[in-house]
Amino acid sequence: MARIAGVDIPKNERVEIGLTRIFGIGRSLSNKILKETGVEPNKRVKDLTDDEIVKIRSEIEKNYKVEGELRKEISMNIKRLMDIGCYRGLRHMANLPVRGQRTRTNSRTRKGPRRKIMKKK
């Protein structure tokens, strides 16, 4: 297993797919990284040389925010919205949909399960 950005990448996966295991790297970014480092995308992770792994690792560390650093930035952005009290921040605080979806029906994922209300007798 190759370890890149703190993530173990399975040996038998293709490199372009294996890199997508890292939070913040999708297929297009994975292909871009491999093109910049000169590594064949269809190569299996087990066939990579140590030099190629070091190239990929240094390219990611140098140019991209991934894993913990990216998660921290996202959470800080949400916290900033909540601190300034803007509409999006208020929606985050209330655990409601942030991007304008309807809430009269739907939005159960964001609101959580329905709460039971006792019937009047």
Curated annotation (Swiss-Prot):
Q: Say yes or no: keyword Oxidoreductase present.
A: no
| InterPro entries linked to this entry | Rbsml_uS13_C (IPR027437), Ribosomal_uS13 (IPR001892), Ribosomal_uS13-like_H2TH (IPR010979), Ribosomal_uS13_bac-type (IPR019980), Ribosomal_uS13_CS (IPR018269)
Question: A GO molecular function for this record?
Answer: tRNA binding
Alphabetical list of SUPFAM superfamilies matching this protein? S13-like H2TH domain (SSF46946)
Region Disordered: list its residue ranges: 99-121
Per the record, GO CC terms?
Answer: cytosol; small ribosomal subunit
What cystine linkages occur within this chain? none
Keyword RNA-binding listed? The answer is yes
A biological process term (GO) from this entry = translation
Keyword field: Ribonucleoprotein, Ribosomal protein, RNA-binding, rRNA-binding, tRNA-binding
Oligomeric form and interacting partners? Part of the 30S ribosomal subunit. Forms a loose heterodimer with protein S19. Forms two bridges to the 50S subunit in the 70S ribosome.
Member of which family? Belongs to the universal ribosomal protein uS13 family.
Q: Please identify the protein, giving its name as recorded.
A: Small ribosomal subunit protein uS13
Q: What is the scientific name of the source organism?
A: Thermodesulfovibrio yellowstonii (strain ATCC 51303 / DSM 11347 / YP87)
State the taxonomy lineage: Bacteria, Pseudomonadati, Nitrospirota, Thermodesulfovibrionia, Thermodesulfovibrionales
In the UniProt record, the gene name given for this protein reads rpsM
